[in-house]
């Protein structure tokens, strides 16, 4: 029986290690620690291994920002692609290990013997890049597109039509070796000529990585006017649209960075410059049909976005240790956004041919509780609504604190101020209430409700009393309780009961939490209690003899496309119920605004519509 063998250098030897592959950096880090101890200070001027670690950190952060416009391929990067390209940094690991062996050998000069800058070394590197690296990569790349080499090696790199910056590193060991030789040839020549420098090492490697990432970013960053004014530049630098044609058609545009070699080799795609111009002018720009308007929660979660850490944002938010050293940088961005910023696009996906986007107001959770910031936040939300209206967006759904009752009356402020809005503004809380209510077992006769006089609490109480379920409403305000009770039909008002202490619920096993509970307050719940909740942030589960529900959420339909970002702490494909409520509002084509108080009579209608469109409870 014949045994199929994998092609040489087609898989990574440390693949079985999983995340433990980063232990391979151990000897390099150990060398730096040893030199640090010997010298009594950070060996910045004497340790190549330290420079390798610094380069590793800088290379791993090479990334480009998404923009609303200028996307080359309209498709999004979904979870399947992210998982497939998860180990994009294998090439960086390999290059770091090879470099560590070279720099610790006697052949390589010590950093103390090198100048910080040598212009002649830079000139040599440029000449060697054009004369050696570019043609070598071009012909190697063309060879990789031949039958057996393509199927055994290069086809993996072409797995997806929509590329991202990290796709640049998603290669086999053979391709990685080719790229390493191509990238390092100019450095080797400059050092052999005696004109190497520290700046050349940093500058060349980071510029090489940046240009590779730029090409794969799928975002056009060079103006077509640059090529119109200086036509010769078309042959000296490629563009993301240029590379996208290669990934799409696979028979042209093979160059590394310089289209000149495609022109000389007869493989330059004639559509390259026209496509670049169209993308730059925004001709392929598409107006979103639905927008979910969020805000930043806190400094750490601000890094949970695809244009900062694609891998982290593809998983439910958690405080990863790798994010903590970057906290000062994220804090700096928060300060910058406080003074000069505007609403920006976070992510997008497609559902049944319609484009859905998530926009973010550049404000953090704590800022919503600063009285002096209220006016500015409302102005930002208002500008986002007006921009969406001008663009032709059909529905805009407000998330979390953007629809805070004290801030803007759940969106009522904007609808009243702009009565002619074409975009429908919704808070999505009708579906949020429906999700919570449908979690409650049918045999429950009594519930305990905190946050009872809030917008959601009111709707939940009025709905349950109509089902003849006794609702213990925790509130100190008799006036607010009476106002809600009077809204209920006379025959059901008896089922709404005001309580002022948690002790009143010590025999009730169904708690609906709309206000944060401390461990002491949770103690009053009897054993076996289930905590349903609509409080943000979710309560911490201190009781081991009780169960805790998650925030109201729904799973998007299975035919969603291009979804590659988790919504805060939600799982993959799961969104907050208010987000789902906006989606349902759009899919149904409802023409009313959903702002202010929740219409209890519409809860069942919205729930049934959500199920009809393929959304399911998460």
UniProtKB/Swiss-Prot annotation:
Catalytic activity: a long-chain fatty aldehyde + 2 NADPH + O2 + H(+) = a long-chain alkane + formate + 2 NADP(+) + H2O
Keywords: Endoplasmic reticulum, Lyase, Membrane, NADP, Transmembrane, Transmembrane helix
Gene Ontology MF annotations: aldehyde oxygenase (deformylating) activity; iron ion binding; oxidoreductase activity
EC number: 4.1.99.5
Family: Belongs to the sterol desaturase family.
Membrane topology: Multi-pass membrane protein
Tissue-level expression: Expressed in germinating seeds and stamens.
Major localisation: endoplasmic reticulum
Inducing stimuli: Induced by salt stress and abscisic acid (ABA).
A Pfam family it matches: FA_hydroxylase
Protein name: Very-long-chain aldehyde decarbonylase GL1-3
Residues that span the membrane, as ranges: 9-29, 46-66, 91-111, 121-141, 174-194, 289-309, 315-335
Domain Fatty acid hydroxylase: 127-267
Biological processes, Gene Ontology terms: lipid biosynthetic process; response to abscisic acid; response to salt stress
């Amino acid at each position: 029986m014949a045994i199929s063998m994998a092609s040489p250098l087609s898989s990574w030897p440390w693949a079985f290690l999983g995340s433990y592959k980063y232990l391979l950096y151990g000897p390099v880090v150990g060398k730096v620690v040893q030199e640090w101890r010997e010298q009594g200070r950070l060996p910045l001027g004497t340790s190549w291994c330290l420079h390798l670690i610094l380069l590793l950190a800088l290379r791993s952060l090479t990334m480009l920002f998404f923009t609303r416009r200028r996307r080359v391929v309209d498709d999004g990067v979904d979870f399947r692609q992210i998982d497939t390209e998860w180990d994009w940094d294998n090439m960086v690991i390999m290059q770091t290990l090879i470099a560590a062996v070279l720099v610790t050998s006697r052949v390589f000069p010590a950093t103390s013997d090198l100048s910080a800058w040598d212009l002649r070394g830079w000139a040599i590197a440029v000449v060697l890049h054009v004369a050696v690296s570019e043609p070598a990569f071009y012909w190697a790349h063309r060879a990789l597109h031949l039958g057996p080499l393509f199927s055994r090696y290069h086809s993996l790199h072409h797995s997806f039509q929509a590329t991202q910056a990290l796709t640049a590193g998603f290669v086999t060991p053979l391709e990685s070796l080719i790229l390493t030789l191509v990238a390092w040839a100019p450095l080797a020549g400059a050092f052999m000529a005696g004109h190497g420098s520290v700046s050349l090492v940093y500058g060349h490697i980071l510029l090489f990585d940046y240009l590779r990432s730029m090409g794969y970013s799928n975002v056009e960053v060079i103006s077509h006017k640059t090529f119109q004014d200086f036509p010769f530049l078309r042959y000296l630098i490629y563009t993301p649209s240029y590379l996208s044609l290669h990934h799409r058609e696979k028979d042209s545009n093979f160059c590394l960075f310089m289209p000149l070699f495609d022109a000389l080799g007869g493989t330059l795609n004639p559509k390259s410059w026209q496509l670049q111009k169209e993308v730059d002018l925004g001709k392929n720009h598409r107006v979103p049909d639905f927008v979910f308007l969020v805000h930043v929660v806190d400094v750490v979660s601000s890094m949970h976005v695809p244009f900062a850490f694609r891998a982290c944002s593809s998983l439910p938010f958690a405080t990863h240790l790798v994010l903590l050293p970057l906290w000062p940088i994220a804090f700096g961005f928060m300060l910058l956004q406080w003074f000069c910023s505007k609403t920006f696009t976070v992510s997008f996906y497609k559902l049944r041919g319609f484009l859905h986007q998530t926009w973010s107001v550049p404000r953090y959770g704590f800022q919503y509780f600063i009285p002096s910031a209220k006016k500015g936040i409302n102005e930002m939300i208002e500008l986002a609504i007006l921009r969406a209206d001008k663009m032709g967006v059909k529905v805009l759904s407000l998330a979390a604190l953007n629809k805070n009752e004290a801030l803007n009356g759940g969106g009522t402020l904007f609808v009243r101020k702009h009565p002619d809005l074409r975009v429908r503004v919704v808070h999505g809380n009708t579906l949020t209430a429906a999700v919570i209510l449908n979690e409650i077992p049918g045999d429950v006769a009594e519930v305990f409700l905190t946050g009872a006089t809030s917008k959601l609490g009111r709707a939940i109480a009025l709905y349950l009393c109509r089902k003849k379920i006794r609702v213990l409403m925790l509130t100190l305000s008799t006036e607010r309780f009476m106002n809600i009770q009077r809204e209920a039909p006379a025959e059901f008002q008896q089922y709404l009961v005001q309580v002022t202490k948690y002790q009143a619920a010590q025999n009730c096993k169904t708690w609906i939490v709309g206000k944060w509970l401390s461990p002491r307050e949770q103690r009053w719940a009897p054993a076996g209690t289930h905590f349903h909740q609509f409080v943000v942030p979710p309560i911490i589960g201190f009781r081991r003899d009780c169960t805790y529900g998650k925030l109201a959420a729904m799973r998007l339909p299975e035919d969603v496309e291009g979804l590659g970002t988790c919504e805060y702490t939600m799982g993959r494909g799961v969104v907050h119920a208010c987000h789902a409520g906006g989606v349902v509002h759009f899919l149904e084509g409802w023409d009313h605004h959903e702002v202010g108080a929740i219409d209890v009579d519409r809860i069942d209608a919205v729930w049934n519509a959500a199920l009809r469109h393929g959304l399911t409870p998460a």
